[in-house]
Curated annotation (Swiss-Prot):
Involved in iron-sulfur (Fe-S) cluster assembly. May act as a regulator of Fe-S biogenesis. The lineage of its organism: Bacteria, Pseudomonadati, Pseudomonadota, Gammaproteobacteria, Enterobacterales. PANTHER family: FRATAXIN (PTHR16821), FRATAXIN, MITOCHONDRIAL (PTHR16821:SF2). One of its GO terms (cellular component) is cytosol. GO terms for biological process: iron-sulfur cluster assembly. Keywords: Iron, Metal-binding. This is Iron-sulfur cluster assembly protein CyaY. It comes from the Bacteria. NCBIfam families: FeS_CyaY. Disulfide bonds: none annotated. Belongs to the frataxin family. GO terms for molecular function: ferric iron binding; ferrous iron binding.
């Protein structure tokens, strides 16, 4: 994968997250902001999830209250380089915990 393809894939990932949060109708207030390739999700309780791209490594990094995760693209999925879990699974787990209610991105 070259840098332009990596940017296209991560831009698509960011847009998907933003669209899902815009459509979300849960009880909690969840805000999403994209700035300089960094996506920040802010929850009503003040906690945050930070997602950014690591261009030199062609990885997506996810920082949550539970810890940090690094994802490599394998086929069509971003997969954690330690646990083997998918990006969407770990993001949903963290968002659900930090929002205090179920949050789905799929």
């Amino acid at each position: 994968m070259n840098d332009s393809e990596f940017h296209r894939l991560t831009d698509t990932l960011w847009m998907t997250i933003e669209e899902r949060l815009d459509d979300w109708d849960g009880d909690s207030d969840i805000d999403c902001e994209i700035n300089g390739g960094v996506l920040t999700i802010t929850f009503e309780n003040g906690s945050k999830i930070i997602i950014n791209r690591q261009e030199p490594l062609h990885q997506v990094w996810l920082a949550t209250k539970q810890g940090g995760y690094h994802f490599d693209l394998k086929g069509d999925e971003w997969i954690c380089d330690r646990s083997g879990e998918t990006f969407w699974d770990l993001l949903e787990q963290a968002a659900t915990q930090q929002a205090g209610e179920a949050v789905s991105f799929r």
